[in-house]
């Protein structure tokens, strides 16, 4: 085959761009007073995640509203999810105090979970693969916990950065470390979720691309691996929602008790 023919064949072959489905694209351009308020694919899929979470809970407990004795499978799944998050709150904040924050924490868990899982649908978009989304969620948790600590303890909140039992001479070193550690919380919380969602979905996209470009005879192994990895990504999506939720509870507990 001549060099020209090889070049033409290479040009005709489909190009792999595993990061293409992470691109934020404007769907409805909107600009007000020079501020870009466009509705993007990320916005739409976040709305869908909220809608799915709402419908999941509404349909799940429809049987209870109708006084049915035997719960449906959907209701059982919703009750398991409800109990699972409530146990996280009870273990990391405490029963009486934690229940006040349970609705917000449960909503946050469902939002992160469905944002993660909806991204596995072919042709969809994963909002939590965008650092601006995860950073917004993490900063919301951070500012809420910080505000809660200031309201509850006032100037006593400063004591959070002074480790107990540390010699006075070491406080010069330890206090700045504690402050930096505290300020890095939203960074670690957001980057962890963003990095895991981006990495996992990128590998999955590469596997499906190779499976689609191989002849039928060599298709089975990559397709099987991609299917198994999809199941693994479902697990990762759940685990990341769990980690985000449990760290939120830890930060709220620190704000309440200055641990």
Swiss-Prot record:
GO terms for molecular function: proton-transporting ATP synthase activity, rotational mechanism. The chain crosses the membrane at residues 37-57, 101-121, 131-151, 157-177, 203-223, 232-252. It holds the Pfam family ATP-synt_A. SUPFAM superfamilies: F1F0 ATP synthase subunit A. One of its GO terms (cellular component) is proton-transporting ATP synthase complex. The keyword Membrane applies. F-type ATPases have 2 components, CF(1) - the catalytic core - and CF(0) - the membrane proton channel. CF(1) has five subunits: alpha(3), beta(3), gamma(1), delta(1), epsilon(1). CF(0) has three main subunits: a(1), b(2) and c(9-12). The alpha and beta chains form an alternating ring which encloses part of the gamma chain. CF(1) is attached to CF(0) by a central stalk formed by the gamma and epsilon chains, while a peripheral stalk is formed by the delta and b chains. Key component of the proton channel; it plays a direct role in the translocation of protons across the membrane. This is ATP synthase subunit a. It comes from Magnetococcus marinus (strain ATCC BAA-1437 / JCM 17883 / MC-1). The gene is atpB.
